[in-house]
């Protein structure tokens, strides 16, 4: 599973980078990828809002709330 780590990025830059990453990954019809957002509820909310806007399915694992698993 491919992953993107957003640590150290400003929120707006991180969302742009996550959007580009997920859109590229989604060209594969059966994709799943991981976005590492860290321990920031603001970052998580911004990234999940972007994912919702594109209609992607995702979940945040209970064992690691610092990541988002995305699929189509």
Predicted regions and their residues:
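N-terminal targeting/trafficking signals and adjacent low-complexity tails
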Residues: 1-72
């Amino acid at each position: 599973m491919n992953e993107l780590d957003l640590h150290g990025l400003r929120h707006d830059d991180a969302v742009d980078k996550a959007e580009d990453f997920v859109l590229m990954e989604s060209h594969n019809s059966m994709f799943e990828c991981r976005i590492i957002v860290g321990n920031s509820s603001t970052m998580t909310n911004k990234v999940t809002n972007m994912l919702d806007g594109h209609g992607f399915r995702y979940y945040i694992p209970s064992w690691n709330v610092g990541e988002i698993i995305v699929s189509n």
